[in-house]
Amino acid sequence: MLNRIVIMGRLTRDPELRRTQNGTAVTSFSVAVDRDFKSRESGEKATDFIDVVAWRQTAEFVCQYFTKGRMAVVEGRLQIRDWKDKDGNNRRSAEVVADNIYFGDSKRDGQ
């Protein structure tokens, strides 16, 4: 079976490095990805906000070199998580687990 995803978009906020109880580096952030078509109603392109999680060296790399607004290319796999909200309701969310993250622009373009 195959579960691969590649997205390109801009980070919506600065990533922050966290550590699990055993010291593993992790970060999560969102990437704003413009759709290829315009809305009939507004004439503007819609944007999808895609959640991404990165672990270990990938997390450290993202936190060191990427900031809000920077264009990124993310390769990874789609993961669906089931969880309960504060009211006990079952919820489901999708996120990309990043294997690799590349610069989608030059440093000059991203600042």
Which residues make up each language-model segment?
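Single-stranded nucleic acid-binding surfaces, predominantly the OB-fold ssDNA-binding core
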Residues: 1-111
